[in-house]
Every structure is written in C-alpha cells, then in structure tokens.
Amino acid sequence: MSTAGISDEASASAFTTAGYCPQLIKGIDSVLIIGSGGLSIGQAGEFDYSGSQAIKALKETGKRTILINPNIATNQTSYSLADEVYFLPVTPEFITHVIKRERPDGILLTFGGQTGLNCGVALQRAGTLEKYGVTVLGTPISVLETTEDRELFARALKEINMPIAESVACSTVEDAVAAANDIGYPVIVRSAYALGGLGSGFADDDLQLRQLCAQSLALSPQVLVEKSLKGWKEIEYEVVRDRVGNCITVCNMENFDPLGIHTGDSIVLAPSQTLSDEEFHMLRTAAIEIIRHLGVVGECNVQYALQPDGLAFKVIEVNARLSRSSALASKATGYPLAYTAAKIALGYTLPELPNPVTKSTVANFEPSLDYIVAKVPRWDLSKFQHVDKTIGSAMKSVGEVMAIGRNFEEAFQKAFRQVDPSLLGFQGSDEFADLDEALQFPTDRRWLAVGEALMNRGYSVERVHELTKIDRFFLHKCMNIVRMQKQLETLGSINRLDEVLLRKAKKLGFCDKQIARAISDDLSELDIRALRKSFGILPFVKRIDTMAAEVPAVTNYLYVTYNAVKDDVTFGDNGIMVLGSGVYRIGSSVEFDWCAVNTVQALRKEGHKTIMINYNPETVSTDFDEVDRLYFEELSFERVMDIYEAECASGCVISMGGQQPQNIASQLYEQGANILGTSPEDIDKAEDRHKFSTILDTLGLDQPRWSELKSLSEVKHFLDDVGYPVLVRPSYVLSGAAMSTVYNSEDLEGVFESAVAVSPEHPVVISKFIEGAQELDIDAVAYKGSLLVHAISEHVENAGVHSGDATLVLPPQSLKEEEKTRLKQLAAQVAAAWNITGPFNMQIIKTAEGGHTCLKIIECNIRASRSFPFVSKVLGVNFVEIAVKAFLGGDLVPPSCDLMARSYNYVATKCPQFSFTRLPGADPFLGVEMASVGEVAAFGSNALESYWVALQGLMSFCVPLPPSGILLGGDLSKEHLGRVAALLAPHGFTLLALSEATCEYLSRYLPAESSVTVLQMPETGREVRALFEQHNVQCVVNLAARRASSPIDPDYRIRRSAIDFAVPLFNEPQTTMLFARALSAYLPAELEMRQSDGPETPSYVLPWREYLGFKPT
C-alpha cells in the first residue's frame, strides 16, 4: 500500500491529531452544485451517484447546499439531500438566475459531467462568477479549459515531455483534411467539449474524413485530428490530488478491447491484468506527473494508449472531473472518490480525511484489491430501425454492469449474465454469417462473436487475436471457460457430475442453469442446485474493504465467490432484502434506483436491517453507506436465493427494481422466499397478458378488443372482425420490447415472430389499436386490495407512443371531475381484484364512442413504475415510503388519501430525453417500443410554462430564433402540420418546405402575408448540411404518419439529418402543437431577455420547496 506524494507539511496533520483544525477555504457557507441533467448515452446515472456523494460530504461539513438539476428521477433531487433544489435546465442562463437568487459562496462544476463543466466554462467567460463573487471549488476553470481544449492540452503535456498522439486542432473541414494529409492516414477525429466521444471517429481517406468532420463540427466548435493508434492497449488511471500536491492513484483499469473502441463501450478489467510491474509504475508515475502539472484539485481520469509489445505509450486524454470511469473505480475499490473530491474542493488535504470504509486509515492510502472486477457495457441498438450497430470511438451503450470475482473467469461470466439475464455466461451465437468480419469489425455483439469463434467454430487463440487484437492473455482465460463447457457437455447425465468437477465449474463462474444446459436439455437449474447443496458446495461471502483485508473494515460491502474457504461476515440479522434494478437500459434507469434507495431508507427508518442486491456501478443503491449490507451481485434466482438463505432474510422486496426482479418473483416464492407485498401468483395474473385481459373481462372493466395470438390463421380471423390497426404485445417484457402496431397484412408475420421470440414461455396478445385516443397513467399504492394513494398523469402524445417516451403533465389539466372519479374507481377495482399490497401502475386510454367518453384499461404493472419519482416529487408525497408501510402492515399503514381531489397552484411537466445523436442511422420516430434514455422535468404556473422550461432542459433543444428557418413536412392528410405552421408564422420565422404539395397544403392554413419557401430535396448528406446552413434551419417539424420502411424515405432522411446536425426535431403532432403554443407565448420574453444586459429573473425560477408550499422531509 503506497502513500507516495505526501508532503511533510500535510502529513503532520492527520485527522486523528487531537485539536487539529483543517485549513479550509474561507468564506464558503453555501455551495451551488451543478447536476448533469437528463440521462443520455455517455452521461448516465454515475453523476447521480457522484452528485449525491458530494452533497453528503458538503452537508457533513455544515455547508448549505443548493442543487440545480432538471432530472426529477434522481436520488440527488430527493427530499433528504440538498437544502434547496431547482428543477431547472442546466444551462448558463438558468444557472445565472439561480446564482442571482441564492447568492452562493461557492460552486462545484465537476460533479455534473460534461454538461456541468461546459456551463462552468461559459459562466467564467461571461464574467458571471466574478460578478456575483462565486468561488469555483476544486479544479480551477483554467485547468478544465486546458483539459477540454485539445490544442491547449497538447501544449501543456509537451511542457513536461509527456508523449501524446501527433495531432492538429481544426475548426473547419478543409483544415481537417489538410491536417490529415500532413499526419498521414488513418486518423482519429476527436471533438472538443464533447461527451462520450460524441462526434469522434476514424477515417482512412479524405472522403470519410469530410463526412465525419461535417457532423463533428455541427456538434462542437473544434476537432482534433490525430494519428490513429487503433490496436494499442487502452489503460486508465484514476488519480486524486489535493490543494497541497498530495497525489494517489486509486485504481488502474485495462480495456479488454484494444484502442479504437470507446472505453464506455469496452469491457474493462480492474485492476489491470496484462501490465508488467514496469509498465504499471511507468503509467502511474506519468499520471501523477500530469495531474500535478495541470493543477487538478480533486479527482481526475487519465487515459493511455500503450504499445502491446513495448514500453511506448501515448496520453489519450484527461478528464478533470468525476466521470463514468471514476464511478466504476469507486465501486471497484470501495474508495469513495466523489465524497473525497468534494471534501478536497473545500480545502481538506488527503491525510486530513478518514477512509470512511475502514474508519481507521486515512484517505491517502492507495486501495489494494484481492479480487478482479469486470465491467461489461449494455447496448439496446436492436430497439432502433436502420441503426449502425458498429462500435468505435463514439459511445453507444446505455448502461454497464460490474461483476466481482476471485479470478477472471468468475467475474467475466457473472458480468455477461448481469448484462442480459437470458444469457448463461460466456457463450457464442450462430447469428454471424461472416464470423471473421464480425470479429474484425466490432459491433454490439462482439463478445458473442468471440465466444462463437472459441466455443463453437474451433478458432485458435492466435486467429482470434489476429482478427480482434484482443490480448492473448484474455483469450486464454476465455479458453478455460470453453474447456470446462466442453467437459460438461461430454457427461450426458447428472449422475456423472461429481463433486470435484462441479466445484471446479462453480469456481470458473458457471451458474447452475449453465451447467444443467451443458449436460442435458432435460435438466433444470433446480436439479443442479439440489446436487450442489448435497455436496455442500455453497458460495462464500467476501468483503470489499479497500485494503485487501490488511485492515479491519466496519462496512458491509460484499460479494459472493466460490474461490474462498470462509465467509468474511456472520449472519443472523434477519434483514429485509431489496432487489435493485440491475443494468441501466432503455426502460429501466435511474427512476428505479430512486425507488430502491427510498425503499431501504424507509425500512431503516422503521428499524429494519436492510440487504441490497444490485450490480450497477452507476447507482446510489450500490453506495456502501446506503444499506446495512450491500451485495454487489447478480439478480438471478440462483444468486438471490443463495443470499436469502445465507442471510436468513425475513422478507424480500421485488417490486421496486423494475421488470428484472419481477421476472424471478415466482421462482423465489416457490422456493419459500417471503415476498413482501403483492403475491407473485397475483403478479403473474397481471404480467401474463392473457390472464390479465381475461380477468378484466370477468370484472366487466372496459378494454380494447383482444385475443391471444397462437397462430397467424387465428390472428387473421380476429382481424376480419376488428380490422387494422392492431397492437401486438408479448408478456413479461420491459419498455415495450417487441411490441408493435400493425397497420397491414404485410407487416403482420414479422411482428408475430418477433413477439413470440422475445417471450417464448408466455402468451402474446393482440388487441385493437384505437387511433387518436388520449393516454393516462395512474401510479398508486394499495394495502390488501384497498387503494391508499394515487396520481393521474396525462400524456401529451396520443396513445401509440410508449409511456416512457411520453410527455407527462401532473396534475391533469384536461380531465373533468367525473373522469377523475371514474379513474380512481378503476384503480380501486384493479387493486381489489389483484389483491395488491404495495405499488402499481396502470395505463388507460380515453376515447369517444357513440358520443360518450370511454376509459379503457390497456395495462397494469404491479410494481413501481418509472414515473414514481415524478409523481412523488410533484405532489410532495413519497409513494415509495407509503408502499413500504403497506409492506410492513399493521399500525404503520396510513389512511387513504385522495391527492387528485386537492387543489394545486402549479403544474409539472416531464419530457423524455433521447440520444439519437449517438446512434447513427437510427430513425428518430416514436412508437410503442420505448426509445428514450432519460427525462427532465420542470414546474410552472401552468402546463405551457412548465413545458417551456422543461424543454430547455433537453440536451437536443435550443430555442429557435427568428428569422431562422423552420423546415416543415410530413403527413398532409391531417390538419396538425397546418395548425403548427399557423402558430409559428406570425413570429418572423422563415417557413421552408421540400415539395410544392407541402407548400400548397400550408397555404390553406397561413395568413395571406405569410409565405413558404420551397426547396429541392437534397440527394446527399452533404447537400442536406448545405441546405441547413444556407437557410439557417434551427428547427425541423416532420409529422410523418408512419415509421420509414427504408433509409431512402425522404421523411426519414430529413429527420435523421436534423439529428446529425444538432437541429431540434419535432415529429409527433400533439407535442409539436404544444411546442408551437409555448414558443408563441414565450418567444417575445426570450428575445427581450437575450437583448438585455441584466435580464430579470423569470417568475418560474423558484426552488421546489416554494412550488410545493412546504419543505418535503
């Protein structure tokens, strides 16, 4: 364990010295923390974790904390953390308004990702921080600018003779081409001030470079053209430095994939596995030298390219802020990086800070690991049409998992099961028509291609290495798994599986189901489980303590392994187990982490010991100090049951982690686990589409006409009766996976096959799709079938857009009192019919039939939904806390309360955040399968105001200003496009169309003095970009009636071009109308504010507390 870099001055003042008083930065009583905004690809839940840690650290030191973050789903915007929360856009303008109102003494910029950092730089350049006397805490802005500006960065590293890739900073396409010709192809292009490699990529010639730079420079003011080092090893070091120069390296990590794939899309191992001692210390020394020379104060990430067969290395980049890698390093080592960085920002030095894990060592001890951590990314590219599935220097993954084991094989296999529960471990797939190509040109299925080559196609380690450039060490480790798999396959019968072989397989990370499947199709995982237990083969529980057990630890940060001889902990507390959400993916994100964290907090408040199981390094729920016992483990039946039995748990909460815990509820229940809340038998009656619809019919509750889909011939009989369009829905899926709206017979067969494939063990239901219906969400909590509390949110979009992609308004603005009463009755009837105890969510459509309003139930999930944080925070009532009291029962159960009967003088709107910019080729068209990756929300005095503020919190939006161009197109058979144009025309925008037919259509809606300029449809991407630039297009409205069937579809090309060139896109009629109304209402004030030197703070810039009228507790 190393204490290198500690000065004499600092080490004399260790935190244990009696009477010692740290020399903190003076005059800092209140601190503004900049959040990262809505989750997106490249900037996800890791900033909720780091921001929450920072707030804890500041409050512990007695500082008043003010947070600005529109992401209402986060833990950091919870009741119990910051003193003041502003649900406002993270932009320089809104941050300025908050600074004027709150007058903070200090500001933290490095806990809000790239968004927060960019805002800080903009505020400094505008003179705002100096004007209001706000001190930047931690790393100075000049240092942040140096690390973000590629030219300044290169110059700084050359000052200390640190090797970097030869590079040239460019601000035009022609400059980039000239630079590449000087450097020599292949080159990599990197964008300045960009997140997750956005706008970066490789180019082998001038044509590729021009196409890449055209897009990159639309997203960033500067690009760096540098010599490609594709194929070198990629190594990362997490470094911490305090104000007096003490430095430690907290963790070093090695990418399984060679350089060329963004680290966020790479499999990562910690600690590094293939470095020699010389290489390790060479890079460690360089990292410390870099961070000292730059002057970073706090946490920093240094990325290297290392020559595979020599000691040459190049510095790729430095992130002088908390990042995705720092969250991983923090969870991998147990060292609280964000907490420590926040303390350092206040002026503490490393020797003055205790290690909160051991409580007996100081923070300047470098962590030591006696285990291996594997991080594997999760992609959801299959949800998108026409998307480019190759992976490279621009990040595309939506989440990641972290697995812990005592050897590579154990951690590696765990990680793959965590990424996708349908997988058994390291395995192949027969999907690759050209396996060599799949290995050489990586996609999101890369590791399956490696598994197929080694496990099923007989490729040698050398051949796979030549095609992939993956280090031979890793491939030989994979071969250990392959050999065990082959050995198991030869057995043929469980009777031939002896104790020695079974134990060896478990030590290599094989799960029970994987072993059963290898031996015989007739075996189940329960067969292997019974045999394993009869042999006494049980996993051991080990502790992560940052010190490799050299120093006793007081926390319970745990993992499970078969590579041990004893447990590190004792059992018998009979705690309540809470299952987390697992990997972030489209449909399951930070919302469920909020639910899980609030569950354990509510349980602890009632005096119960808590056990959390989760494996997501980006989450607050996997923070060591949130629960009594944290297991960084799989959410599989096998692992959950192992822990449940070892801990002698008194109960298990499966309804707060989204769909994944729900999917194993029945297995846990059948094996004797005490499931708190609704019985899994009743849950199954809601998850199974056939059972659900049958019960609704029995109760006489209205729903769209439906039938169980068993064969295409039966479907056609149903269609003869109800007609198109219809909705096809599988059971037990999340975020509308494989759900489709079918408009014609040509699409039906493919949709049918996809739905059956995604949920083969459960029925698929087909129902009549009712066009033009309004969709409503009900979030509720019940106790033994009686409704306790509910909230009704309105969708802005009509039914047909997944609820996770919908814009929600709460309280509802267009519902009549009798409709709200009927909705409450429906919720109460469902709660009673399914005997619900705990959370549930319903989706209902409102439609007119025969002159009457009809409310039809379309779905019910007996678990917390992704809108639980939204309704809890908007209404000021914690739905999760009420659900926990329902779980516990007795006198704790609160009386029923009708929140929808109350009067509210504010409205909140939640908007989805998409990451189409990150997904080249993906059609940004909304449908019944979810596509958004995050959300933002805002409060206002009315729905229009709250929507206008929320909209500005989206990364993809900037306010279009007249006389800029707005390009209009799409479905001309309905009036939506014309009504939008009529609202926009009076404000001086230049209205553009790409056909005479569109122009003629629009003329019917526009006043005589308005005109539409008709442009010719561009044929190439370069021509589209030229058109956008020439006509200053700042907004695209494309209301196509259907998703594009082909990439040559004109509407698709325009939608995709808007995304590629960072132009706001509106493509859903109701949302577009709301946008047009909001722009008409607030544009005059926006223009006036932009022209004013000291604009007045808008009335909607208020803290959450003032909207509610009380401070939530």
UniProtKB/Swiss-Prot annotation:
Please classify the protein's predominant subcellular localization into one broad category. Answer: cytoplasm
Q: Which GO terms describe its biological process?
A: L-arginine biosynthetic process; pyrimidine nucleotide biosynthetic process
Provide the binding site for Mg(2+) 3.
843, 859
Q: What class of enzyme is it?
A: ligase
The cross-references to InterPro entries, in alphabetical order and at most eight, read:
ATP-grasp, ATP_grasp_subdomain_1, CarbamoylP_synth_lsu, CarbamoylP_synth_lsu_oligo, CarbamoylP_synth_lsu_oligo_sf, CbamoylP_synth_lsu-like_ATP-bd, CbamoylP_synth_lsu_CPSase_dom, MGS-like_dom
Quaternary state and interactors: Heterodimer composed of 2 chains; the small (or glutamine) chain promotes the hydrolysis of glutamine to ammonia, which is used by the large (or ammonia) chain to synthesize carbamoyl phosphate.
**Record function comment:** Large subunit of the arginine-specific carbamoyl phosphate synthase (CPSase). CPSase catalyzes the formation of carbamoyl phosphate from the ammonia moiety of glutamine, hydrogencarbonate, and phosphate donated by ATP, constituting the first step of 2 biosynthetic pathways, one leading to arginine and/or urea and the other to pyrimidine nucleotides.
The entry's protein name is Carbamoyl phosphate synthase arginine-specific large chain
Question: Which species is the source of this protein?
Answer: Eremothecium gossypii (strain ATCC 10895 / CBS 109.51 / FGSC 9923 / NRRL Y-1056) (Yeast)
Tell me what gene encodes this.
Answer: CPA2
